[in-house]
């Protein structure tokens, strides 16, 4: 079984059966986003497949999930483009990574959703066993954040932000 098949098996074990998949390409980079509709109540969860192929560029062997509750098509495009940005910039990817400028991807996205950035962290809302595949591939979670949340992170750091989320059971 190859790595892609192991990742898919892992997703289906924890997220359920996927209901669809879309392929995204940007230059030399190719990723897929799988959709899972039963992971979180009233949300569609996107899960990347292919980020781990570029682990040498971002110093991290990983895949990322992102639950969204509205505007699924546009959210998928924004999420995929944020992942491409991580790859193109060869960012040192991990917990606390933030991608700003969502309106550069889809005009007025921030205004329509009151969200201005994507925040990446550990997949704390799922069982701990979800967080790794075979001790070398890490699973992250992403979510949209508001301007106010972004400002909080810039002022106090990701540790304080995540403490706040934990205290509020977000």
Residue ranges and their predicted role:
Residues 1-61, 65-170:
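Acidic, proline/glycine-rich low-complexity IDRs
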């Amino acid at each position: 079984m190859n790595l892609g098949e192991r990742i898919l098996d892992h997703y289906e074990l924890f997220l359920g059966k996927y209901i669809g998949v879309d392929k995204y390409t940007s230059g030399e980079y190719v990723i897929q986003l799988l959709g899972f509709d039963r992971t979180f109540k009233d949300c569609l969860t996107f899960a990347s497949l292919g980020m781990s192929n570029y682990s040498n560029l971002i110093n991290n062997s990983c895949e990322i999930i992102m639950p969204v509750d509205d505007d699924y098509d546009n959210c998928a495009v924004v999420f995929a483009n944020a992942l491409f940005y991580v790859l193109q910039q060869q960012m040192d990817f991990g917990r606390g990574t933030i991608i700003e400028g969502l309106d550069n991807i889809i005009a007025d996205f921030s205004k329509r959703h009151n969200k201005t950035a994507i925040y990446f962290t550990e997949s704390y809302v799922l069982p701990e066993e979800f967080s790794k595949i075979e001790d070398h591939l890490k699973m992250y979670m992403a979510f949209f954040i508001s301007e106010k949340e972004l400002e909080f992170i810039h002022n106090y750091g990701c540790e304080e932000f995540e403490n706040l989320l934990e205290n509020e059971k977000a």
